[in-house]
């Protein structure tokens, strides 16, 4: 069975230990493949290299990777997007990379303080958001066109945008797990992440090839 756009992640600590990777070039059959090197722990050094590979059925594909600690990062068309924005009554919605709330923060205030109610991430196929509250439900945005849309609609598609072919929120998450979420399980029933010391959402990587969003709960009493 052929694999199309199969995700590949290279651990740079294992395969390029000691090299401060600033640029990476991935080539297959003479064609450059978009890739990205991500710093996932905030130490300003790349931890992982991500790209997608096409692998033929019952065959093989050779991808050659060149890493550099001096070249400038390579630029590729954006295929993904992730953001975390603060709610602003003036409509500016400033973008932040991480936000942490104390465990006793009011759930509704926390939920409403973020534009879109949580971290948003998308590919050209679909978009998702993770609610910043004790549910942490994942909501789904369906698309009719192969493109990035969140910077245009922000999950709140207008009638005019719908008429232009934009997608929209297609799932009522409510109290469910939505498109999937982390929950506890007590007395044969799923339960929310209620008693914590703090809650945090962080955008660890924002394209162009992949996005990485971290949802963390500190000191959960379960």
Regions found by a protein language model. Name each.
Residues 93-96, 133-134, 142-155, 207, ...:
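Extended interaction regions within the primary functional domain
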